[in-house]
């Protein structure tokens, strides 16, 4: 287990689920497009993700409509969409019946191995206390914020020349910041479509 610095109420073991469907098994579902500052250090252009918005919203069963307006010099009003999708329920049969997908359960990706420090030769996994090596032409690491960092950090620990030491892997992660912004009385005649919490 990793050491938690700061918020003692945060429990990393409950912030992600190691199960088929991942953290969507208990996520809140609040969704919105990323801001420019979210991908500042990524090898992406500002609008490169825009072409994927429609398909992403279809996957999440939400409308591709996100209003954003400026309230003042310091505050913006941002609209979220709520998704109740559980990926295990939605895609289980599709994945099991696919001829192009091999579903491997009860197996944990430990780290990537590279002998030339330029590309991944294979992924080393642990299954039933035995080591498995998985080779592929391409690897897409999509295990979520905590697991991606853990895998990359352990890969760097095994081979410090493969992953740049200066990359801020595993830094700046935090749990949902919750704040009680205020309490008010709602006029029933006004729009009451929003019924969630504020993150």
Range-by-range predicted roles:
Residues 24-25, 31-33, 110, 145-147:
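Short, solvent-exposed loop/turn segments at secondary-structure junctions
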Residues 6-12, 17, 62-69, 161-168:
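A short alpha-helix-loop-beta-strand transition element characteristic
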Residues 31-37, 156-161:
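A glycine- and small-aliphatic-rich helix-loop capping segment at beta-alpha/alpha-beta transitions
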Residues 1, 112, 123-196:
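Glycine-rich loop(s) and the adjacent beta-strand/alpha-helix scaffold that form part
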Residues 36-39, 43-120:
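Conserved redox-cofactor binding core of oxidoreductases
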Residues 1-31, 45-56:
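N-terminal FAD cofactor-binding segment of flavoenzymes
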Residues 18, 25, 106-111, 125-129:
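FAD-binding core/adjacent interface of flavoenzyme oxidoreductases
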Residues 22, 105-106, 141-143:
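Short His-Asn-centered micro-motif
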């Amino acid at each position: 287990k990793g050491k938690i610095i700061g918020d003692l109420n945060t429990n990393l073991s409950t912030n992600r689920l190691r199960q088929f469907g991942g953290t969507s098994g208990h996520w809140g579902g609040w969704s919105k497009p990323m801001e420019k500052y979210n991908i500042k250090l990524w090898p992406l252009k500002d609008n490169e993700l825009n072409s994927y918005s429609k398909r992403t919203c279809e996957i999440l069963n939400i409308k591709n409509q996100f209003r954003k307006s400026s309230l003042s010099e310091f505050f913006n009003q941002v609209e979220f969409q709520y998704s109740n999708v559980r990926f295990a329920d939605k895609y289980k049969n599709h994945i099991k019946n696919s001829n192009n997908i091999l579903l491997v359960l009860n197996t944990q990706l430990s780290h990537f191995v590279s002998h030339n420090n330029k590309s991944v030769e294979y992924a080393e996994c642990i299954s039933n206390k035995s080591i498995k090596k998985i080779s592929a032409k391409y690897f897409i690491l999509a295990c979520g914020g905590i697991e991606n960092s853990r895998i990359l950090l352990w890969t760097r620990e095994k081979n410090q020349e493969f992953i740049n030491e200066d990359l801020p892997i595993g830094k700046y992660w935090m749990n949902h910041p919750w704040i009680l912004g205020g309490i008010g009385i709602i006029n029933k005649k006004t729009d009451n479509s929003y019924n969630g919490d504020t993150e």
